[in-house]
Amino acid sequence: MEYIYLLRQALVYLTTIFWIYELTISLAALIKFKEKPLVTQKKHKFMAIIPAHNEEKVVGNLVESLRNQDYDKEFFDIYVIADNCTDNTAIIARDAGAIVYKRFDEAHKTKGYALNWFLKQKIEENADYDAFLVFDADNIVDKNFLNVMNRKLCQGEEVVQGYKDIKNPSESWISAGYAFFYWTMHRFYHLARYNVGLSPLLNGTGFMVKFDLVKNTGWDTRTLTEDIEFSLKQIINGKKLGWATDAIVYDEQPEKFVASWKQRCRWTVGHIQCMKYYMKPLADAVKEKKTIMNFDGLLYILGSVPMFIVSMILMLSNFGIYFFDSMSVEGLIVNLLKFAIPTFIFPIFSALFTMYIDGKKIKPMLKWIAFYPLFMGSWILINIKCLFKQDIAWEKIEHVRSINIKEIA
């Protein structure tokens, strides 16, 4: 029993230090920092890349929003990768004004493969672009997106994540859960880290990469979370990613639990894959470079599945001590509340606070706020499942919200 006590106490200290660190960093999200100075003044040329698999219902609106950018038309091109499509995605995208590349490879369906296939061709062509932007086909892009990313390039940034807002935040408790989660992460993880000189992470869509950065390697990713993988590879190489709150892209979220479950299972397996491939390189980078940014990247990996395992061990240890008559019922309840409050209750207050300071419309979201702990709690079951079953194939998330930028604005 003494060993259980010692293990439990060590894990308590470990998790306490971890969360104190996270809380300290997150406070930087409340401080307004000055914009970085410009290191050059140039109108950069972009290519917007849209991987799309059977997205005929939504891709036209995305292309339209890109064509309506408040940016000189001769300085950007729109490419749609019609990836294993069996519908009219290619026709609709071309009619909307995009340049369409058709790809057929049933064995390699993920966005990472499509990006690598497309960028390899552009690298071989020595295409005349300064940077590329990546969007999901269901997105709608704010008209100032390219202007903001051009400014970021002029500030010397090479990889920048834009602000992924939500097209359908109040449609269901599931889409609301995504909205609460992303809004909170945007401010208290990504912006906070950017403010203190650490690295935010790419977020799947609405990001910019300087073209020169991939000319030697291509888009070389192999996990189910190509965005996180690419981010970690940059951090290992000592490159800090940028953040652009005012480069806004609206993304459609699942509205049904089954679709959300499948998507988040894929993300969790992707994180496990990233942990497998990049935990040691990150640890080596911490040892060699001795930078807080590398250490923070390592903590991100450790803070996902490993920290979940630690939390589960801590929670279950309470039952072990209780069953051996070394803890009262009251003590068991108190210790379980110490786990439940930060896991299920704190997210409600953090979501409400984030909406308030970011000027989000709170009233339409109030009907779903009580369900947010259920959304976050379901991640516990997802993590447990994915620890034991990781042979998850990529499955398409259906996008049906045909909304244009005028309807959102």
Regions found by a protein language model. Give the residues of each.
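Juxtamembrane C-terminal module of membrane proteins
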Residues: 24-44, 280-293, 297, 321-409
